[in-house]
């Protein structure tokens, strides 16, 4: 992530933590870390985000025209500055959005801001700049009509989280329409779930879609989530290596082919979301997942994650194994692994707070600050499903 703005001030880790408990001893907070793991896990109890999370929110909101959540319009200057490929923008917006939902749950004073940003996130998600690859690749001009669960699953979950956070019915009709499309497509398919591109089935993208059905049920008292059992049975029977606690890379229903490589980022993403729906499922495979993929190093202070088996290389493939495992560790309440992974991920990215805004000089992946933000604030997908309504609803807006 590179910015054209000049650096005017850099806040030290100790100064950053002022006002959020006593600063940790140097041995507890390595250079390049911005808060302790204990402080991240205590945010909800304290009803306050850590100062570095507040600085991340400033990055997302503060600078006119170029902050990601400046306006509902189809301007994407923030992503251009980060050199985010068009096909990745949908994921960037979605993971920001899931973090914003947790911010709303953590701090009642920030709930209105989180809802405002979620509104902008949904609006931007519908811009053709976000979904245009579907048309460009020749798959159709309507990104939600069929398939494309890699896009419409996120959009549906974002619709639901926006209404949970704000109480607003702004997108309720669109949400109902898309939920029916997803549910009916699942019911019509001879396999459990929906493909991304034609004949490309990814379990992690389906985890988003099924979780979106649970959120819809929470809002409207329906029972779309009943489809989840058949999906979990399917992926457990056909798409997971039970000995290694890992999902295979992809499934191709027309031929029945399953790519034989297991994938850490696929598994971490999926187990994190499934834990919100069926905790026992994720808890069954989490220890085996760690044994298969996680390498602890630097005398126990750090951990990194192999993307697949048979290699010692960390973060191969799409480069997101460690970051998604950070989210999974947070979802599972695993403070030790969360701390080790953050020690591995954050310091090399050279974070700084400039004019109250967090930025990373050397982000480690295309979704680096999105996933670190999400993991730092993540209250748990089950907790989001149980989110209490806002004190004052924006009904009808």
Swiss-Prot record:
**Disulphide bridges, residue numbers:** 74-127, 196-205
GO molecular-function term, one example from the UniProt record: intramolecular hydroxytransferase activity
Which positions make up the signal peptide?
A: 1-26
Impact when changing residue 196 to A/S: Loss of activity
Activity regulation summary: Is inhibited by molecular oxygen, high salt concentrations (NaCl, KCl, or MgCl(2)), urea, and Ti(III)citrate. Activity is not affected by EDTA.
- InterPro entries documented for this protein: Ldi (IPR041411)
Domain of life, per the record? Bacteria
Q: Which residues form the active site?
A: 64 (proton donor/acceptor)
Keyword Isomerase tagged: yes
Could you tell me what reaction this enzyme catalyses? (S)-linalool = beta-myrcene + H2O; (2E)-geraniol = (S)-linalool
Q: What's a single GO BP term from this record?
A: monoterpene catabolic process
Q: Where does (2E)-geraniol bind?
A: 196
Q: How does it assemble?
A: Homotetramer. Homopentamer.
Its biological purpose: Anaerobically catalyzes the stereospecific hydration of beta-myrcene to (3S)-linalool and the isomerization of (3S)-linalool to geraniol. Is thus involved in the initial steps of the anaerobic degradation of the monoterpene beta-myrcene. Also catalyzes the reverse reactions, i.e. the isomerization of geraniol to linalool and the dehydration of linalool to myrcene. In this direction, the formation of myrcene from geraniol may be seen as a detoxification process for the monoterpene alcohol. Shows a relatively broad substrate specificity and can use various geraniol and linalool derivatives.
Other notes: Requires DTT as a reducing agent for full activity in vitro.
What's the protein called, per UniProt? Linalool dehydratase/isomerase
Q: Which organism is it from?
A: Castellaniella defragrans (strain DSM 12143 / CCUG 39792 / 65Phen) (Alcaligenes defragrans)
